[in-house]
Every structure is written in C-alpha cells, then in structure tokens.
C-alpha cells in the first residue's frame, strides 16, 4: 500500500495529516516548528521528542511505546538497543562531521550526532566554542584543523565522491559516511552497531 506523502520536516502539509485522522503524531523538537505542533494538537494527540544524547534516545523508545499503548514493546526495544550499544567507548580518533556545504556546517557538541560519535569512541573535532548546534566553519578554522578526518554525511546534504577533492585540498581527510547511522535514533539504532564499530576502527587505523 502506498504511504501518503505529507511533506518534509520543515514544510509539512497539515491538511493532509488531518485527512489521515491519525491517533498520534510524533514530532521532533529539533525538526518541527512549534506552530506545526500546535496545529496538529488541534485535531490529534502529539508526542514531541527532544533527543540530544544516547540516554535520551533510549528514553524516547519507551515514550513512543507508551504513547502507542505498546509499553512492553517499547521496553523491549530499549533493552535490545541498550544491550547492542553497550557502554561508551574510550575516545581515540577525532573527526569533524559535515552536514552541509556552502556554507560548510558541522555537527556541534549539543547534538545527537555528537553523542553517537562519542559513544563509539570518535571525538568531535568541531571547536567547542563554535556558536550554535550546527556551526559554520570558516576557512581560517579549517586551516587550524589540517590533517583532521572530516566525515561527509549522505544527508541532509548529499555529499558524494565529487566533494572529497575540495576537502583534501584544504588539508583535511575526507570520508563519505552513512548519515542515517549517525543521526537516526529509534529502532534504526539496532541496525547501525556494526557500521559504527567499523567506522571507529577505520578512523583509529589512519596514520597519524
């Protein structure tokens, strides 16, 4: 059965959502606007998630289970993912994580991406003093990060092999990565364990 298209996170079609008569709308504080959330609350229940850390992601699984009246399933999902993810790893490798091009924007330190990197032992090389959750990095800051690996995510900006030369010429070490593995929380976390382990090992094995 074809799933109706209701728009993207920034531009949702409220009329189409209302026509579907949902029992629940799950929104993200980071992605969805207050206006859209309040508009949805006029015709249905809304659960707003605010996930910035790995424990936040674990708790969101149970919250979604409760909201769907599937509390036991939520607890099971949480338990399975907590077991799969284990304890945070010691940090060795450092990397930037690029989410956008022109201007270059990277994941800052108050993001789920940062938390996922840290959990798997990848330090975030973005300047701690950079403003905003996804700060822009000007050329002079890149100069100071010469030799640093930069992870070029597949989303939201679709980085591809054609972009690698630009970053290599700036003295960085570009690597294309699956954006979903680093930025999608929820049940997807169960399927990204091996990928994130391998990415950490790859970074650790880079010559210094």
Locate predicted features.
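N-terminal ligand-binding lobe of clamshell/alpha-beta domains
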Residues: 1-208
